[in-house]
């Protein structure tokens, strides 16, 4: 027997028993962004490696350790996209979507990072994100947060997530803070772990994001970025908080919150949860006003967020919020005898035409009544339609209830669509 080929570690199949939950989640996402007037953009999975080096930052973990990068047959360095924002900016610049325009965009698709697989975090993962271009005011920062909050409401998990906010200031403010933070960290250089020592000069704000409790203890008296912010940045952040208060969205200001990507400025945020064990991030984003210009476009304000769908699916399963996911089949059509089978196929096709939203599965492969009913029950259908010799002769269909304790009913063939429409 030939050796079975397995899926690559950290890259998972979504099986038929799992896909209804994914479809429900994706429907909620699409309906919500549509309600806010956002348009979908789809970009290639493979991009030039330089795109991510220039956007994410060459000294970030993603670029240094996690990207799937390879040379193609022409010797060009290509990378499987590790996140969606850079590709969206590249597409916007390339197709003239951004300069002197306002764009509200959303995307959804697979991303790739070579990191250690763990529950809810994989090497291929599905990401959903929104990006807004051309608006620099705090009201649009509030809008993307309101949109994310609406997602939690529709998914039923509002009480299980907390919004954390911070502001990183503009580049000049951050540079002044960077110098102060380096000066503070240098006092403890020998006590820092190897990763923090490396980050201290290349990306010192990321030291604030350390998971090492010993390093966290050293940061207790570290200077805070808020102390280095100018009046304009403070006003922007204050107005954002005012807007969130006005619509009743609760938040926590976390002065240690930084983002793992270099392009963020001013507003940054994360929605976090403790429902998956240790506190984890389920959605993150912020403002990145310099990225469009950094990637060859004109100076364009921008803000957005991204979320990994695997973590949301895991959260819905953990909180047992998957019980109302409907089966993939509404009606299962069976037949007893060759002549009846032809009629059953015609009935199934007719129902699909008359009731386009009805999910109809026809029994294929023959078998006795017991076998067909077993398949019908396994399909998850609400009812089975039985067409035997008697039903065929009388131009009727037997409707057998699979989920309710009700007597089987005989329905005239020409009244079947109306009967099923009222039933399901």
Swiss-Prot record:
Task: State the protein's name.
Answer: Histidine--tRNA ligase
Any one GO MF annotation of this record: ATP binding
Enzyme's top EC category? ligase
EC number assigned by the record: 6.1.1.21
- What HAMAP family does the entry give? His_tRNA_synth
BP term (GO), one: histidyl-tRNA aminoacylation
| Organism lineage string | Bacteria, Pseudomonadati, Pseudomonadota, Gammaproteobacteria, Alteromonadales
**Pfam families, A to Z:** HGTP_anticodon, tRNA-synt_His
**Domain of life, per the record?**
Bacteria
Q: Does the keyword Nucleotide-binding apply?
A: yes
The family assignment reads: Belongs to the class-II aminoacyl-tRNA synthetase family.
Q: For this protein, what reaction is catalysed?
A: tRNA(His) + L-histidine + ATP = L-histidyl-tRNA(His) + AMP + diphosphate + H(+)
């Amino acid at each position: 027997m030939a050796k079975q080929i397995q899926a690559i570690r950290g890259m998972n199949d979504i099986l038929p028993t799992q896909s209804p939950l994914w479809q429900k989640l994706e429907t909620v996402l699409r309906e919500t962004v549509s309600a806010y007037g956002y348009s979908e953009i789809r970009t290639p999975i493979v991009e030039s490696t330089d795109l991510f080096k220039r956007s994410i930052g060459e000294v970030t973990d993603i670029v240094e350790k996690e990207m799937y990068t390879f040379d193609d047959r022409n010797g060009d360095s290509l990378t499987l996209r590790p996140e969606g924002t850079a590709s969206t900016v590249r597409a916007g610049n390339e197709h003239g979507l951004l300069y002197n325009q306002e764009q509200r965009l959303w995307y959804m698709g697979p991303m790739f990072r070579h990191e250690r697989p763990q529950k809810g975090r994989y090497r291929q993962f599905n990401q959903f994100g929104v990006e807004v271009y051309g608006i620099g005011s705090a009201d649009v920062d509030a809008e993307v947060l309101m949109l994310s909050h609406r997602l939690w409401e529709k998914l039923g998990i509002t009480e299980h997530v907390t919004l954390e906010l911070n502001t990183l200031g503009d580049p000049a403010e951050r540079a002044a803070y960077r110098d102060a933070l380096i000066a503070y960290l240098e006092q403890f250089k020998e006590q820092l772990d190897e990763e923090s020592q490396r980050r201290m000069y290349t990306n010192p704000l990321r030291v604030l994001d350390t998971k090492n409790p010993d390093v966290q203890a050293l940061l207790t008296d570290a200077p805070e970025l808020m102390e280095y912010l100018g009046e304009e940045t403070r006003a922007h952040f204050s107005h954002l908080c005012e807007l969130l208060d006005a619509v009743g969205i609760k938040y926590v200001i976390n002065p240690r919150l930084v983002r793992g990507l270099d392009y963020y400025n001013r507003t940054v945020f994360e929605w976090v949860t403790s429902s998956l064990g240790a506190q984890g991030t389920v959605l993150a984003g912020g403002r990145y006003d310099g990225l469009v210009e950094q990637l060859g476009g004109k100076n364009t304000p921008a803000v957005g967020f991204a979320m990994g769908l695997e973590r949301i699916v895991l959260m819905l399963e953990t909180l047992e919020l998957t019980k109302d996911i409907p089966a993939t089949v509404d009606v299962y059509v069976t037949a007893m005898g060759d002549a009846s089978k032809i009629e059953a196929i015609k009935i199934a096709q007719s129902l699909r035409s008359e009731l386009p939203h009805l999910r109809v599965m026809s029994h294929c492969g023959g078998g006795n009544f017991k076998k067909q009913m077993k398949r019908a029950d396994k399909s998850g259908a609400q009812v089975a339609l039985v067409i035997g010799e008697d039903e065929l002769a009388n131009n009727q269909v037997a409707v057998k209830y699979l989920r309710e304790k009700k007597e089987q009913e005989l329905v005239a063939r020409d009244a079947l669509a109306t009967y099923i429409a009222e039933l399901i």
